[in-house]
């Protein structure tokens, strides 16, 4: 057997450099789009798990409900659609920071899916913001979402970084 680090850049590099054949010491045929195939499968798995979490009542849909779940400490993670406005992301990010400041958990945020993908998986329309809630289905969905995030190697969202800086600067100004 052979191992490849589970991120897109390493898989693509292994395909390009024919490292599977070298590691297995024999000629192997690897699809040129293996990295994309793995991404699609991880994405499908994550979206399916999100749908199951919703059916189990462990997803809060909408900015207001997601923010309330974060502030109450019930949220395991926050999901933002790619189309999410900076203002909505900022408000939920502030709620996440306030929760941490109050001694609550550090709630991760993920921006991996489009509005259409989230809407289809979660059974809603115009799903821009959602929160995964505590429970077995929520934990399982978070595990799959986090695996996709790691595979894609996505850096923190630029809107979130900017919102964090604005919040930190405002806090420094009031001191």
Regions found by a protein language model. Give the residues of each.
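Short beta-strand-alpha-helix junction that forms the catalytic/metal-binding core
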Residues: 1-7
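Short active-site oxyanion
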Residues: 1, 56-57, 75-77, 103-108, ...
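Short, glycine/charged-enriched secondary-structure capping and boundary segments
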Residues: 19, 92-95, 124-125
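Arginine/glycine-rich "motif VI" loop of SF2 helicases in the C-terminal RecA-like domain
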Residues: 71, 96-105, 123
């Amino acid at each position: 057997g052979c191992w490849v680090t589970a991120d897109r850049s390493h898989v693509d590099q292994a395909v390009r450099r024919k490292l599977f054949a070298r590691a297995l010491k024999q000629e192997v045929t690897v699809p040129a789009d293996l990295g994309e195939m793995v991404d699609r499968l991880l994405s499908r798995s994550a979206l399916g798990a999100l749908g199951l979490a919703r059916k189990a009542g462990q997803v809060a849909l909408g900015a207001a409900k997601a923010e309330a779940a974060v502030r109450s400490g019930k949220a395991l993670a926050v999901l933002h659609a790619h189309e999410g406005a900076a203002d909505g992301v900022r408000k939920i990010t502030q709620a996440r920071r306030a929760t941490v400041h109050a001694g609550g958990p550090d709630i991760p945020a993920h921006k991996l899916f489009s509005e259409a993908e989230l809407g289809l998986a979660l059974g809603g329309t115009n799903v821009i913001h959602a929160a995964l809630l505590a429970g077995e289905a929520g934990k399982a969905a978070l595990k799959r979402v986090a695996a996709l995030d790691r595979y894609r190697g996505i850096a923190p969202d630029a809107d979130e970084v900017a919102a964090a800086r604005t919040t930190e600067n405002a806090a420094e100004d009031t001191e």
